[in-house]
Amino acid sequence: MRIDFIRQRLRAQGAKPCHEQRILRIWAQVLPTEGGRSRPDDFLPQAVRDAMPALLADLDGLARLRSQHPGEDGSARLLVELADGQTVESVLLPRDGLCVSTQVGCAVGCVFCMTGREGLLRQVGSAEIVAQVVLARRQRLVKKVVFMGMGEPAHNLDNVMEAIDFLGTTGAIGHKNLVFSTVGDPRVFERLPLGPVKPALALSLHTTRADLRAQLLPRAPRMDPADLVERAEAYARATSYPIQYQWTLLEGINDGPDEVEGIVRLLHGKYAVLNMIPYNTVPDLPYTRPSWEAAAALARTLHRRGILTKLRQSAGQDVEGGCGQLRARELAPSARRIEIRPVASLP
């Protein structure tokens, strides 16, 4: 379901634009309706009031909590059931953040990701994306939404941008706290600067080598990492938001000295931060995370070379909070490790 469908349904009952906006604000922000200025009886026409119970029931059915798995780090992994019975994952993050899904499945096929193993099943509508935020807000405060769950937002651009515009206005989330995460797609760099709400941009880089990136992200657009960084830098300068480059650390694959040199070459002097996240190990996949000590040494080396680097723990590591693990692990066939020449670890 798209947000515009909700508006059309309200208009069909005689709601004016001011009524639509107040109803949608109450829903998106999870505002109380008993007492105060938000009581529907005080501002809605009778026909709209009569239609509200059915509408609210349908909105509640857009995203229902099937299971919740708290993590020791303050995160919580949510398995969310959509109205048609399909499931996606959301992750409540420490410090008032939420990671939402934009597709059921994913077509990019990252070799280290569970979600991509089942392919793309369907798009998640803009109202379903917002419904994940509403579901989370009923449990805790949400001030930041990252579009970094199941799916590639660039492959569902209309719904994702509609949800971003809605959350950045009616949903009362600061524009810099809406983070569009992508593997990189020319359409993203064309579309994001045009919207009324311009989100922060996170770019899944993972390697500076075009050949290796093609192996790790086999169905991502064939854009050279240098071209990706150039386009992202233009967006960063236009919006005054630094680009968040995402780097999943895979032991023996993208954690060697050659990548250090590549990162310095691409990112030195750029308006950016490099987020290095040790791989959230999946039992069914043949990849491992480097030790925390090795990852920290890598981050320190990059700091010394002038790259703003943050080493992060993957949220929900103890509850398998990585993208698609809960939903996809029993559906996917066994994986085969790609043949990549190992590189020496940093001294």
UniProtKB/Swiss-Prot annotation:
Cofactor descriptive note: Binds 1 [4Fe-4S] cluster. The cluster is coordinated with 3 cysteines and an exchangeable S-adenosyl-L-methionine.
Say which species the protein is native to: Leptothrix cholodnii (strain ATCC 51168 / LMG 8142 / SP-6) (Leptothrix discophora (strain SP-6))
What protein am I looking at? Probable RNA methyltransferase Lcho_2507
Q: EC annotation?
A: 2.1.1.-
Gene Ontology cellular component list: cytoplasm
> Which terms in the Gene Ontology molecular function aspect does this entry carry?
4 iron, 4 sulfur cluster binding; metal ion binding; RNA methyltransferase activity
Give the top-rank taxon of the lineage listed in the UniProt record for this protein. Bacteria
**Keywords per UniProt:** 4Fe-4S, Cytoplasm, Disulfide bond, Iron, Iron-sulfur, Metal-binding, Methyltransferase, S-adenosyl-L-methionine, Transferase
